[in-house]
C-alpha cells in the first residue's frame, strides 16, 4: 500500500541473460516468480488458464478485502513493465504441454504455480446437486463471473434457506 500511495517504482530488470523461463499460473506465486526472474534478466512468459490474470487474487478474494483495480491490476502492470509476457486462456496439458514449451518454444525451465488445489468433498448425498458449490467454485462464480447479478449468464440463485458447511473465511 505504501509503495502504491507514494508511486515507488519497482526495481528495473537487469540486461537479458538469454535464458527463457515459463511460469504456469498468474496467481501470487506465479507473479512473484515471474517478477523476481525478470529482475535477474530472464525472459519470462506467464501462461494463465483463465481469461483474466491474477489467479486467486482475482477469483478467490472478494473486492472488499483486496481491491482489484487499486492493487492487483497495478501489481500486474509492474510485472509487465519488467518485460514479462502474459498469455491467457492457455491450459497447460490441453492447449500445450510442458514438453512442447521446452522443446518447441525453447524454454529452459518451467515454474508450476497452478493455484489452489481441488476441493475436498464429504461423500454425502446431495453434494453434487445443482446449487451446491465448493468454496473455490462459489468464489470464482462471485468474483470472476459476477454470479451475484441476475443479469449475468451464471447467476447463483438466492433462496431463503442456505446451508454453509465450514467456518473459514469463505463461509463468513
Question: In which residue ranges do the predicted regions lie?
Answer:
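Ferredoxin-type iron-sulfur electron-transfer modules in oxidoreductases and energy-metabolism complexes
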Residues: 1-13, 142-143, 149
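Rossmann-like dinucleotide/flavin-binding elements
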Residues: 20-47, 87-102, 114, 118-120, ...
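Short amphipathic alpha-helical segments
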Residues: 35-36, 58-59, 122-126
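Glycine-rich FAD pyrophosphate-binding loop
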Residues: 42-58
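N-terminal glycine-rich dinucleotide-binding loop that anchors FAD/FMN and/or NAD(P) in oxidoreductases
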Residues: 60-88, 127-142
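N-terminal Rossmann-like NAD(P) cofactor-binding module of classical short-chain dehydrogenase/reductase
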Residues: 111
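Flavin (primarily FAD) binding-site architecture
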Residues: 114-128, 132-133
